[in-house]
Structures are given as structure tokens and as C-alpha cells.
């Protein structure tokens, strides 16, 4: 088992280095060495993104961690909207299973796999940010991305105060609300 975990770790690290560009690596990246394919090379949030970014902090890939922050920040407004649209929640986040990396609206609904009920997404996506803080301490990052500057009204972000803590609070609010009898009934 330790050998398998080591292989997964190095496979993820390879995917991150070979395919990430300035953001997290896409699903197809590890197969073709490309990160901006014209076909639906989605970011698969419930597995591929997390496996591929798992080695970034422990390997000292600071820039990859910063790219992951931009990837997350670009999507948070849609995550908040997803929680409101699917569950009627306020100040909470619901992460989709797949995203194009720029927007993250819930668009996949399937009777065989209930994509819209992947409730563990926020915690899953927070882990690399927590590890970034554990590895590098408090950091301030700067973007030159006009869309992020427009979205947030600034170009610098304190990773703990502007990214991690607000997202953690929204994840907490999700679980606090879903534990409410309005969403959950013990039968």
C-alpha cells in the first residue's frame, strides 16, 4: 500500500508540473501534456484536480499553489450561487463535480449519479489551501488577471484572510444549514 500511495503522489506531481500552466491541471492534462484543449477538458473536482495538486506544497512548488488560489477565487461566486440554487442556502458554497475553470455553475444533473449532491466538495478543495498555509505560512499573493481584479476589486490577497477563512466559513455555513431539519430528517 505505501508503494501505491507513493506512485499516486508522484503521478499527481507529474500532472501538476506538466499540465498546470498558471492554474490547476485539467482532467486531460495528464494524458496529453496540454492544459487548454478545445474539447471538454474539464477540471474534475472530485478526484483529478486534488490528486494532481497533492504534491505541490510538499514539493515546494509555491507558484503552483498560487495558481491554485486563482483557480479557486475565480469560482467562489458560482459556488455560492450553486448552494443558493440547489438548496436555497445563504452564505454557503456548493462545489460542482466538473468545471471549465473559469465558471463553476452546476450544469450536470444525472439520475444515475447525482452530481448536484456532491456535498463534500468544499472541504476537499480547502485541503490544498490549508496545506499551502502550513507550508509557507501567511502569504500575500498578487494577481494581474483583470477578471479577478474586477471580481474582487483588488489585486492582492492575503491567503489566510481573503481566501482560506472566508471559504472555510462558507463551507461551515453549508453544513450548518444542511443539518437543519429543512434539509435533513432522521427517519
Where are these regions (language model features)?
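Acidic/histidine-rich catalytic neighborhood
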Residues: 154, 165-187
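Short, well-structured active-site flanking segments
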Residues: 21-30, 65-66, 136-144, 177-186
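A structural signal for well-ordered alpha-helical segments within the folded catalytic domains
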Residues: 6-10, 47-50, 66, 123, ...
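Structured segments of extracytoplasmic/periplasmic soluble domains
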Residues: 15-18, 55, 71, 75-78, ...
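Active-site lining segments of carbohydrate-active enzymes
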Residues: 60-63, 67-134, 140
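Solvent-exposed loop and edge beta-strand segments that line ligand/cofactor-binding
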Residues: 2, 36-46, 109-119, 187
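Acidic/polar, glycine-enriched structural segments that form the non-catalytic walls/loops
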Residues: 1-43, 61-83, 153
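Well-ordered alpha-helical scaffold segments within catalytic/enzyme domains
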Residues: 15-17, 51-63, 124-139, 148-156
